[in-house]
């Protein structure tokens, strides 16, 4: 088992009808994942407060697609890939990115 995170980036606004269908589709996806024996830890991100590009200029908000949600879970690599591929988000203008993650190393004790 490894730690994984799904990152969701919104690229467009969805209609009220799409929102209803998306809720049903995501509920079905959650059930599929639970049936695989995987527990999900979902998080929603609010609007960007500040984004500082590499060149150092500060901007309010973010002009590109917005990182809107992320879901953390533990699974095998094959399960993680299947979980990402099954997610309905792309049908609603949301990209899905799968990454493995590790916890930061503990700080060295101070002398």
Predicted regions and their residues:
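Conserved, structured core segments of small domains
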Residues: 1-111
């Amino acid at each position: 088992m490894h730690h994984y995170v799904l990152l969701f980036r919104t690229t467009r606004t969805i209609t009220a009808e799409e929102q209803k269908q998306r809720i049903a589709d995501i509920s079905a996806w959650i059930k599929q994942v639970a049936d695989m024996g995987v527990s999900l830890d979902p998080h929603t991100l609010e609007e960007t407060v500040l984004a500082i590009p590499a060149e150092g200029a500060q901007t309010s908000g973010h002009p590109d697609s917005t990182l809107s949600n992320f879901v953390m879970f533990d699974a095998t690599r094959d399960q993680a890939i299947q979980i990402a591929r099954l997610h309905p988000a792309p049908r609603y203008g949301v990209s899905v990115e799968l990454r493995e993650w590790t916890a930061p190393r503990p700080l060295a004790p101070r002398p």
